Amino acid sequence: MLEKTFDPQSVEPRLYAAWEASGAFKPAEDPNAEPFVIVIPPPNVTGSLHIGHALNNTLQDVLTRFHRMRGKAALWLPGTDHAGIATQMVVERQLAAAGNIGRRDMGREAFVDKVWEWKAESGGAITNQLRRLGASCDWSRERFTLDEGLSAAVRKVFVQLYKQNLLYRDKRLVNWDPQFQTAISDLEVEQKEVDGAYWHFAYPLADGVTYQHPIAFDEDGKATEFETRDYIVVATTRPETMLGDTGVAVHPDDERYKGLVGKFVTLPIVGRRIPIVADDYADPTKGSGAVKITPAHDFNDFGVGKRAGLEAINILTVEAKLNDSVPAEYVGMDRFVARKAIVARAEEEGWLKEIEKTKHMVPHGDRSGVVIEPFLTDQWYVDAKTLAQPALKAVETGETIFEPKHWEKTYFEWLRNIEPWCVSRQLWWGHRIPAWFGPEGSIFVEESEEAAYAAARAQFGADVQLTQDEDVLDTWFSSALWPFSTLGWPEKTSDLERFYPTSTLVTGFDIIFFWVARMMMMGIHFMGEAPFKQVFINALVRDEKGAKMSKSKGNVMDPLILIDELGCDAVRFTLTAMSGQARDIKLSKQRIEGYRNFGTKLWNASRFAQMNECVRVEGFDPSTVQQPINKWIRGETVKTVAEVTKALEAPSFDEAAGALYRFVWNVFCDWYLELAKPILNGDDAAAKAETRATAAWALDVILKLLHPVMPFITEELWEKTAEFGPARETMLISAKWPELPADWIDAEAEAEIGWLVETVGEIRSIRAEMNVPPSAKPGLTIVGAGPETKARLARHRDLLLTLARLDAVREADAAPAGSAPVVMGEATGALGVAEFIDVAAEKARLTKDIAGHAGEIEKVNKKLGNPDFLARAKEEVVEENRERLAEAEAAKAKLEAALSRLASVG
């Protein structure tokens, strides 16, 4: 007999161990089985499972389990990312906390050994947490982006791209983190709003040049008064960068400065003559319309400098201190100390014209927390523009599709405006760049040191000294190879032949560019076809109010704590049910508790079936059932199988979960089992046997359909129900997905039981909306019933009385006074409610509630009709108001219908 309640804490680890030990996570060995392949977005080896991981990996597991049950060779390939900067930071902090010497004092080799030690001891935490989530990955194929096989693939790709002129070394601006002293990607840059200022500086014109500057204007904006100036005003939020200025830009159509283009200013403090250039980047409507240009320390200025042929002067060290390119008094000064010194000098010497306080966005390192500097340095770059063209074409032609489709637009925008990809990082933990520097500026890019020395020997005719590049590759470089390097490339492995390209990628929108696009580029370039047929972009998980989760807000939900408290199945079902396309997930603990109750409902239904001897019967054929309710549940089961299958094939996760929830809770538990009780408690042995077998069969189908989403409770019920009836051939994880013929839907049974369900449901709704006490038993009068309705009434009178809590069901020529109308096909029902309620009080209550909703609708409509609100409010706040409006309108409509119905009562 089943226990009274399901205990996830004891069941989950036992079942997971059994699945893994049985080899169920490995793809079917049948060479004819169609592959279904997902590569996991590799979590950082430093990471722990957060709610975003829980969502992403739940959806991957749902698909993997579904396709495995459909007989495909399902492979979900797991692994972790070495996470260069994150891991190096963790180990450096641990060393510091333990009082050890720093990384640089320790030396590269010793430090990297320490990182490997840390990885061996602590690096497996997140994979164990994925097991807690029920992830059915093939752990025998687990990969790590720094394991030897993947490292060999990385070296080969780097060398081949270099020799194909698609990878090169260049001096360009990068995001520079002065604390970690490395270039970082845009994804590792966090924009923070800070209090700052625009300092307006007057740069004196050189060579005695002056010009007429407008100072008064008429109502049409035409200048009416001028003053002679021998300077031009520029504004900056970073005064220290002026020491690296090599130009001033004005818009070519700006009449104020047309005569100054080609002239020079003398840069204060430095004394350098720098030209005034015309460039569209300068905005005549902002500030003075003139912009100081520092090509080595601003991304926009770098472009202006390239177009105008301006020199790029780097004034910072790797620690963001001023270097020897600046006047001696500033050399070695911290950038922010220099800022104060320069402003003080400008004020003292009279060329500070104005200080304009402002709030502005400043880039910070997401891990270091320090202000990031645009920094001019030699780095390695991939020619992403060339590689992007086939990746664009693959999505344009439908070789790879995005779900939801609107994310294709984001993909196209990024790839059509792509810049060279900086792939080098000034770190020690990662794939060391396979490039060796030799005499006379020579560079040898090879897969091994031996090959580099051989190439140098061939070039110079003798052995020469080579030094390997100290830098490592951007973590995203190795991640870009993930779909094929994990399958054994560059070796021609059987896995690579069988499982590439993969089927579906499930990932977040924030890494479409950083990861998805780069996998597309690399996969097509090295494998000749796109790495996946479909990219499913999952939503962002927010809190119940729609706000982004963050530690500072205190609204973070830890999935491991939720799993401990409420069980893994409840967490998984919630995330699946809320994964509607094109909308974020508003998650609350109450919602998860609700889906835990769904699991309890299934467990209790199974206990009910067991207590009523609803046991699987060898050779039972559902097509032969005779009882209308059994024909009906058979048809409902057929429809649900089709609906869930279609939804998971798409995939449309919320539709699959919705169909499962409705069928299990409403159709099977609330209706079928209730309708079956009279038969199960009756004396008709044949009907009883058929109903028991049908209930057991339908429950088996439910377990199969629910398994991809709620694997633990379904596997436990599968195992426990195997104690009765024929033996199970396999564990549920390996069971065959149900395929049921459409002709099992019986139109006559569907119509008859559908009529009964709708009638009882309608009566229950009336009772609820009119506040009829649960203990009250009103009578139901039927008016205008035809022969079919009369026959149905005769067959189901007892069920109507019980399920609708009625005193009597009778026929009459007219509806009695004080009754509420009930739709019953061609007939009309009249529910006698007047004696059980205070009609006037109910009318007053409904009228008051309607007015309340009307007020809410007016209030929200006013807000949503205000352009200022729409422009200023956060997206989640606007969406929350739209949802409030929809809910209020639906509630008002329902109450108005109830009030209309009440009017007929009295």
From Swiss-Prot:
Residue span of motif 'HIGH' region: 43-53
Name under which the protein is recorded: Valine--tRNA ligase
Keyword entries, A-Z: Aminoacyl-tRNA synthetase, ATP-binding, Coiled coil, Cytoplasm, Ligase, Nucleotide-binding, Protein biosynthesis
Lineage: Bacteria, Pseudomonadati, Pseudomonadota, Alphaproteobacteria, Caulobacterales
GO molecular function: aminoacyl-tRNA deacylase activity; ATP binding; valine-tRNA ligase activity
SUPFAM superfamilies attached to this UniProt entry: Anticodon-binding domain of a subclass of class I aminoacyl-tRNA synthetases, Nucleotidylyl transferase, tRNA-binding arm, ValRS/IleRS/LeuRS editing domain
Amino-acid positions noted as binding ATP in the UniProt annotation, renumbered to this chain: K551
Subcellular location as annotated: Cytoplasm
Motif ('KMSKS' region): 548-552
Coiled-coil regions listed in the entry: 842-905
Family: Belongs to the class-I aminoacyl-tRNA synthetase family. ValS type 1 subfamily.
InterPro entries reported for this sequence: aa-tRNA-synth_I_CS, aa-tRNA-synth_Ia, Anticodon_Ia_Val, M/V/L/I-tRNA-synth_anticd-bd, Rossmann-like_a/b/a_fold, tRNA-bd_arm, tRNAsynth_Ia_anticodon-bd, Val-tRNA_synth_C_sf
Domain of life: Bacteria
